[in-house]
């Protein structure tokens, strides 16, 4: 018989750096998940891309066991990395903080493709360009 799902937990954790401190500990503790076991498994799975923010969806079952799926880093984080910035603009319509090339946008779109609801890479590029625009990053042709 299949296990009964009692909940989902969505978190964004730096890859390879999960620890029982907030926000991970309290979120998992509420559902009764073994926090250290999750941290060990997550860190082992994500150690290759250490430091990048990694979204994770944790499925918690009635017997307090869990499974998790890691997703690709948010487009905003990838754009900041490509543009070599610390953060986006506070006023993106007035202050532009950096630039990225169309080729960099294409690379990000191809990387994000499994997690986006775009039909093709061109649609994914448009989504990434919209994120860049909202962060005050200019996309050059």
UniProtKB/Swiss-Prot annotation:
Q: How does it assemble?
A: Part of the ribosomal stalk of the 50S ribosomal subunit. Interacts with L10 and the large rRNA to form the base of the stalk. L10 forms an elongated spine to which L12 dimers bind in a sequential fashion forming a multimeric L10(L12)X complex.
The coiled-coil segments of this chain are none
The UniProt entry, under InterPro entries, shows: Ribosomal_uL11, Ribosomal_uL11_bac-typ, Ribosomal_uL11_C, Ribosomal_uL11_C_sf, Ribosomal_uL11_N, Ribosomal_uL11_N_sf
Recorded GO MF terms:
large ribosomal subunit rRNA binding; structural constituent of ribosome
List the GO biological process terms: translation
What does the function comment of this entry state? Forms part of the ribosomal stalk which helps the ribosome interact with GTP-bound translation factors.
Key words, A-Z: Methylation, Ribonucleoprotein, Ribosomal protein, RNA-binding, rRNA-binding
The name this protein goes by in its record: Large ribosomal subunit protein uL11
SUPFAM superfamilies linked to this entry: Ribosomal L11/L12e N-terminal domain, Ribosomal protein L11, C-terminal domain
- Its gene? rplK
């Amino acid at each position: 018989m299949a296990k009964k799902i009692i909940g989902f937990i969505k978190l964004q954790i730096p890859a390879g750096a999960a620890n029982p401190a907030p926000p991970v500990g309290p979120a998992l503790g509420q559902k009764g998940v073994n926090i250290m076991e999750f941290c060990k498994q997550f860190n082992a799975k994500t150690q290759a891309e250490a430091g990048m923010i990694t979204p994770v969806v944790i499925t918690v079952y009635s017997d307090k066991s869990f499974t998790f799926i890691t997703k690709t880093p948010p487009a905003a984080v990838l754009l900041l990395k490509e543009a070599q910035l610390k953060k986006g603009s506070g006023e993106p319509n007035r202050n532009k903080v950096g630039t990225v090339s169309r080729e960099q946008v294409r690379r990000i779109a191809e990387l994000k493709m499994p997690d986006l609801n775009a039909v093709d890479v061109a649609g994914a590029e448009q989504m990434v360009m919209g994120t860049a625009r909202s962060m005050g990053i200019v996309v050059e042709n």
